[in-house]
Amino acid sequence: MHKKILVLGAGAWGTALALQLAYKGHEVRINSWKAEHNDQMLAEGNNQKYLPSIEKFPDTLKAIQNWQASIEYFDDILVATPSSGFKKTIFELKDCMLPHQNIISATKGFCHDTYALLSEIAEDIIPNTKFALLTGPSFAKEVANKLPTAVVVASKDIEYAKYTQKLFSNENFRCYTTTDIIGAQVGGAVKNVLAIAAGIAAGMDFGVNAHAALITRGLAEIKKLGLKLGADVETFMGLSCLGDLLLTCSDNQSRNRRFGYYLGQGMSIEESLHKVNNVVEGYSTAIAVYKLAQKHEVDMPLVFATYRVLYENVDPKDMVRQLMTRQLKNEN
C-alpha cells in the first residue's frame, strides 16, 4: 500500500502522525495554518516549533503552503487541528474535496459552538465522505521516535477502519479497529478534562491514593456520558477510554495535566496557560462536557468540579472538600 496523504495541522500530534505515515513509505504533505510555520518546515525540513526532537523529516514528508491548489493529488486527508479549528477545516475541505477522497481525524474534543461530536460535524458538512477517527494513548514525541504505541481506529464503515489501520500500522505502531465511533470520541475528549483534575491533585501533593481514585471514578463518569450518547459499554475498557485516561492523567508530557498541576500549585489560569505555552484541549472541552452532562442529566462530579475551578473561580481546595464530603452512595 502506497498512498498520498495530506495532513492538515502541524502541531506535535499532526507532525508525529505525518512522520508515522512517512515511515510507512507513504508520500505525505503537511500544512500549518501559519504561513511562517510552513516556511520554516520547508526551509529546514523539520518542525522545530512543536517537535524539535526530530532533526530531519524523511524524504517522503514535506510541508505544503497552498494545499487547496493541489488537493486532487491526495488519496486521503488527515485532520489533526485543535478542536477549535476542526469545523472551519471541514468547511474548507467541503469546497475542494473530490469524491474519491475521505477524512481521517486525529482531533480530540467536541464542537465548540454546538457541543456535537466531531464525527457528526464532518457528516453534516460533507455527508457522503467516509470518516475515521484515530485515537488512544499516544504522546506525539514517542510516536515520532518510533517507540511502541497502540491506538484505535474508529469508523462506522468497518472497511474504511481496516483501510486506515493498514495505512498506519507497522512494527512500532499498532492500530486496532472499532465501529463505536461515539465511545471512542467521548473517551478521547473527556479524559482531557479529567487530566486537568489529575494535575490539580498532583500539584496539591494529594498522593497516589487520590490519583487512583480520580482515574477510576473519572472512567465511571466517561462511561455514564458515553452510554447516554449511544456508545458501546465495551469501549470504555479499551485504548480509546481507559488507555488514554491512564496515559493523560499520569505523565507530564500531557499538556492538560501540566496545566492542572500549575493550578494546583497556586498559579492563576492565565499564568498556567502561559506556562504550558500550547493548546490545552481540556480547558475548552470542559465547557462542552459540562453542557452535555446537563442536557442529558448525567451526574459527573469530577467534571463539574473541574469546570467550576476553571470557569466559576472556585478554589481547588474547596473543590476537593466538596467532592469528598458530598452525599455518600453505592459505588455502582
Curated annotation (Swiss-Prot):
Keywords: Cytoplasm, Lipid biosynthesis, Lipid metabolism, NAD, NADP, Nucleotide-binding, Oxidoreductase, Phospholipid biosynthesis, Phospholipid metabolism
Residues where NADPH binds: 13, 34, 108, 140, 255, 279, 281
Catalytic site: 191 (proton acceptor)
Residue sites binding sn-glycerol 3-phosphate per the record: 108, 136, 138, 191, 244, 254-256
Catalytic activity: sn-glycerol 3-phosphate + NAD(+) = dihydroxyacetone phosphate + NADH + H(+); sn-glycerol 3-phosphate + NADP(+) = dihydroxyacetone phosphate + NADPH + H(+)
Pfam family, any one: NAD_Gly3P_dh_N
Record localization: Cytoplasm
PROSITE patterns reported in the protein's UniProt record: NAD_G3PDH
GO biological process: carbohydrate metabolic process; glycerol-3-phosphate biosynthetic process; glycerol-3-phosphate catabolic process; glycerophospholipid biosynthetic process
Enzyme type, top EC level: oxidoreductase
Cellular component GO terms held in the UniProt record: cytosol
EC numbers for this chain: 1.1.1.94
UniProt record similarity statement: Belongs to the NAD-dependent glycerol-3-phosphate dehydrogenase family.
HAMAP family on file: NAD_Glyc3P_dehydrog (MF_00394)
Function: Catalyzes the reduction of the glycolytic intermediate dihydroxyacetone phosphate (DHAP) to sn-glycerol 3-phosphate (G3P), the key precursor for phospholipid synthesis.
Protein name: Glycerol-3-phosphate dehydrogenase [NAD(P)+]
Originating species: Francisella philomiragia subsp. philomiragia (strain ATCC 25017 / CCUG 19701 / FSC 153 / O#319-036)
Gene for this chain: gpsA
